[in-house]
UniProtKB/Swiss-Prot annotation:
Pfam families according to UniProt: ABC_tran (PF00005), TOBE_2 (PF08402)
Principal place of residence: membrane
Family: Belongs to the ABC transporter superfamily. Maltooligosaccharide importer (TC 3.A.1.1.1) family.
Reactions the enzyme catalyzes: D-maltose(out) + ATP + H2O = D-maltose(in) + ADP + phosphate + H(+)
Keyword Transferase: no
Subunit structure: The complex is composed of two ATP-binding proteins (MalK), two transmembrane proteins (MalG and MalK) and a solute-binding protein (MalE).
Residue ranges constituting the ABC transporter domain according to the UniProt record: 4-234
Name listed for the protein in its UniProt record: Maltose/maltodextrin import ATP-binding protein MalK
GO molecular function: ABC-type maltose transporter activity; ATP binding; ATP hydrolysis activity
Keyword Transmembrane: no
UniProt membrane topology term: Peripheral membrane protein
Gene: malK
Signal peptide: none
PANTHER family, sorted: MALTODEXTRIN IMPORT ATP-BINDING PROTEIN MSMX (PTHR43875), MALTOSE_MALTODEXTRIN IMPORT ATP-BINDING PROTEIN MALK (PTHR43875:SF3)
Amino acid sequence: MASVTLKNVCKAYGDVLISKNVDLQIDEGEFVVFVGPSGCGKSTLLRCIAGLEDITSGDLYIGDQRMNDVEPSKRGVGMVFQSYALYPHLNLYDNMSFGLKLAKADKAEIDKRVEHAAEILQLGHLLERQPKALSGGQRQRVAIGRTLVSQPNVFLLDEPLSNLDAALRVNMRAQITKLQRQLGCTMIYVTHDQVEAMTMADKIVVLDGGYVSQVGKPLELYHYPQNRFVAGFIGSPKMNFMSVFIDEVESERVKVQLSNGVSFWIPVDGTTVNRGDRMSLGIRPEHLLSATEADATIHGEVMIVEKLGNETQVYLNLEGADADVIYRQPDTLAVDTGDKLEIGIPAHRCHLFHSDGRACKRLFKENGVDFE
């Protein structure tokens, strides 16, 4: 195990800056997920840590050693790619042991490591098979096993589940999480799927346009996003946003007015808000309520109804909203397309964002989150 430290790291291709002033501390044994949309620089940053890309400026440390100019093979990292990159003519044993054989490791040591990795990954009965005889999930486990036998200080995984179908992805993310907990290893995992990030990570790093937008525990990012980008990216379905007018301001609460004229107080830090400002109110679909239980109500026309059995998702056309408002209830809801529906907004669940995307600090204490 080893810690990973990035100090003001930048990566550029010519005049195009991809990773921008990244400062990050990853502790020994921590499971960290880099998440963000396509093109945000998450895979580039991972490749810089691996040594597959040169760092343009800044410093990278693995443990106490500066690694900027150290060869990839000497950094003590192991990488699993999106593609399995298995040798099709070799069986599983030979695929997993290939790197050790190149390093001229002792035969007994190779056998010991491969057998141990195969036991952990439940591949022991498949070691004589070739990759073509395996399922996608089994192939991905072989790719992980090949990295595991090298006993790296840091595991790097670049979107390893994106080639798998939805059901297998759920199973594999649980297996990878279990493996990391079992080994206690430092693991950095790249994905564009925020559900993977939320379910697997000790700590999430949200990237946007090459910058680190926010770093924190999954529930911290979910309940207390520092900006509108993180609020909209973390959570599925994503947060609803609607335009509001600021009626009154106090130090620990702000009174907002919806497009329908309804006003109510939100418990947020009001020290950066001015009366008369135009701001964005955010509310998650699962936090909306029936109209009788809330501090404020909104009316909309039902555009789409998704009945999933255990829950219902309703898409409402609403004046003042940036897009259709999604209302999510953990039950079957008796509503159809074209109906008029009134739903409620609980003030303590609301988020408030400035026009530049900055969030006002929420003052409501959510369960399971360290609150400062």
